[in-house]
């Protein structure tokens, strides 16, 4: 799950939360913050803590992300300002480390999370978000467009890697990045190209406001659960 840095609020006040949509698209790109699907048709403003639980959160920049209809529907209204800390969030935590995508299938990265946090708290928070969004395609009982699109992205990324192995030119690199940006599913592409640091670095640059503090110089997730400045805070 791509970690993002939205930056400070670009507006002082807005009357309706829908007015935050263009600001969010500019800040983090038109991708679902959770499943990473490209939001071509109907991007929706997502309230991390449900807007029905606290009117003060309805237009608050810190409570807003972008999401697809599938993730918003599955997430529901469970999260509040009180229990928000029971979950990891892509605009606050190292979700690049928290989840892995073997063969393009998302799962909680338990081994890495427990290495960073031996108490198991971070792993539980990641699992809570994973379960809340119903990201595991192996237990879904209903047709899930997120799964279909992710599988398509994995296939395209795999074919792109094969092309890269044959032709490692700057032109090919640029084409791969353009294809990834157009398709979405950042983490799937990062997984497929995990042994190609030149591609990983460019991928991080190409997807808007990806949180670079959570990646090393070769484009791989670092063993941190918070950004360095936050981790240093008592």
What do the predicted segments below correspond to?
Residues 76-166:
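Domain-level detector of nuclease and nuclease-like folds
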Residues 1-31, 53-62, 157-158, 177:
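Short, charged surface segments at domain edges that flank catalytic/cofactor-binding sites
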Residues 124-234:
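C-terminal, charged low-complexity interaction regions
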Residues 25-33, 116-121:
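Phosphate-binding glycine-rich loops and adjacent basic patches that engage nucleotide phosphates
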């Amino acid at each position: 799950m791509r970690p993002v840095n939205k930056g400070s609020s670009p507006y002082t006040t807005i009357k309706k939360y829908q007015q935050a949509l263009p600001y969010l698209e500019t800040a983090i790109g038109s991708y679902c913050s959770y499943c990473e699907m490209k939001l071509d048709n109907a991007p929706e403003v997502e309230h991390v803590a449900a807007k029905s639980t606290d009117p003060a959160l309805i237009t608050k920049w810190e409570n807003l992300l972008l999401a697809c209809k599938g993730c918003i529907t599955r997430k529901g209204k469970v999260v509040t300002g009180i229990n928000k800390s029971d979950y990891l969030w892509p605009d606050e935590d190292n979700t690049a480390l928290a989840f892995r995508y073997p063969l393009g299938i998302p799962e909680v990265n338990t081994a890495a999370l427990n290495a960073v946090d031996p108490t198991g708290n971070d792993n539980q928070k990641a699992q809570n978000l994973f379960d809340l969004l119903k990201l595991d395609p192996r237990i879904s009982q209903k047709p899930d467009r997120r799964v279909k699109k992710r599988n398509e992205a994995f296939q395209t990324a795999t074919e792109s890697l094969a092309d890269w192995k044959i032709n490692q030119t700057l032109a090919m690199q640029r084409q791969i990045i353009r294809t990834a940006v157009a398709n979405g599913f950042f983490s799937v592409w990062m997984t497929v190209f995990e042994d190609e640091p030149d591609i990983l670095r460019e991928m991080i640059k190409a997807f808007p406001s990806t949180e670079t503090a959570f990646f090393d110089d070769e484009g791989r997730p670092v063993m941190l659960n918070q950004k360095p400045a936050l981790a240093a805070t008592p």
